[in-house]
Amino acid sequence: HIEHFYDLKKKLKKLGRQDLLELAELDFSVLFHYGRSDLSVDYNGAVVGPDEVKQIINANEKFSQTVKGFRLISYEDAQAHKHLMFAIELEADSTMDKEQGQSLLDDIVAKLQDINLDFKSAHRTAPIKPEIKIFKCGEGIFDQSHQKLKNDYVWNIDCKRAQKEGLF
């Protein structure tokens, strides 16, 4: 995002960081660039992050009350083909049949194509399309043994780990 120097100056003064203002030689706007971190996956050259997916799920009234959490999983199969999987954890006592799961996947993919032009291009040319796998609350990759202090939204894993986790 872009922060005008005047606004940045007010914020720094409020935070008691006059020392930083004294270092400024020019009063141009500042561009904050957020690079790729470990909180994204690569899909055929496009970067897909959990915030995009979370917004899409939360905006869909049909699924926002049913989905407890998710993971973006990038994995390789035995032939070294890259896959993108949306692993979905359901709320307790919620169910989702195959047709509903496909509907959720279709919604996620369509919305990602709308908001992420790199994804749109990647999806069009990708030999393997995104997948979805639905898990009951606290089961599979969302069970107690996979719990961490901080939610683990992204997995970049190899074939051996994907097989061990039962992803294919």
Language model features with spans:
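AMP-binding adenylation
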Residues: H1-F168
